[in-house]
A protein has these predicted regions:
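Serine-hydrolase catalytic machinery in alpha/beta-hydrolase-like enzymes
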Residues: 5-107, 154, 209-214
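C-terminal catalytic histidine-bearing segment of alpha/beta-hydrolase fold enzymes
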Residues: 192-244
Length: 244
């Protein structure tokens, strides 16, 4: 399938980031790809292009740029930036990006989903809880911790996941150094409690960041194993008609 792509700038386009889409006029599902703490890296742009070839209009918003953080690369700055920027600020610009995607002429706004990595996965949980229109949620090792609510992170995923109204897929590894066994257990229970279709994929030898080449945890063999599961889930949630 022939695709097109474009780098977006907030002052010109309304959002910052990268968009890829099939070069045809038909309306199609839309996917928002939310980045990890390292920001919009090259592999996420490749993911957008791969999804476009599968028929999805795909937007990778640069959340840092949309919040006024300058720089072409944010690799290694994630911890610092998450101490400066609170979740409500992140959620505001995620909402801006989702509306930008859903309002595109080539997107069916009733068929939108999210793929999110690490920090993006953690932030996607409150966003999905607040956005019942969302049709699919795929979380690669969301960086959820068992921590108290603070001004930076005022709402916890354990509570919010119970209210999500769309099918969800979570992918974790047993060697994840951020979300330990008890955190993963509580998150599993919370997603299971929301009553929506839910897939949990766990790999005992996988590390946090296994799908990101810029992460110390990168495991390309794991990324290759998981990707077909992700695309199959998206097809069932966003392309196939809902069951009666």
């Amino acid at each position: 399938m022939r695709i097109a792509s474009k780098v977006l700038h907030r002052d010109q386009d309304g959002v910052s980031g990268f968009v890829a889409y099939p070069a045809t006029a038909a309306r199609r599902p839309g996917v928002l790809v939310l980045h990890h703490a390292n920001g919009v890296t090259a592999d996420l742009k490749t993911t957008a292009a791969d999804l476009a070839r599968l028929g999805y209009a795909t937007l990778v918003p640069n959340l840092y740029h949309m919040l006024g953080v300058s720089g072409d690369s944010h690799i290694g700055r994630g911890a610092e930036l998450q101490q400066r920027l609170n979740d409500n600020e992140f959620l505001r610009v995620i909402g801006d990006a989702w509306r930008f995607l859903a309002r595109r002429a080539d997107v069916d706004p009733t068929r939108t989903g999210i793929i999110a990595h690490s920090m993006g996965g953690r932030l996607s949980i409150p966003f999905a809880a607040d956005t019942p229109e969302l049709r699919a949620l795929v979380l690669y090792y969301p960086s959820v911790r068992d921590e108290i609510e603070t001004a930076l992170r005022p709402r916890h995923a354990f509570d919010l996941a119970r209210t999500i109204k769309c099918p969800s897929m979570l992918i974790y590894g047993g060697r994840d150094h951020i979300a330990g066994p008890e955190t993963r257990r509580r998150l599993w229970e919370s997603f299971h409690a929301n009553g929506q279709p839910f897939e949990w994929h766990f790999y005992s030898h996988a590390r946090h960041g296994f799908a990101s080449p810029d992460s110390d945890g990168y495991q390309p063999e794991m990324a290759s194993i998981v990707w077909p599961l992700v695309t199959d889930f998206l097809h069932r949630a966003l392309v196939e008609p809902p069951l009666a």
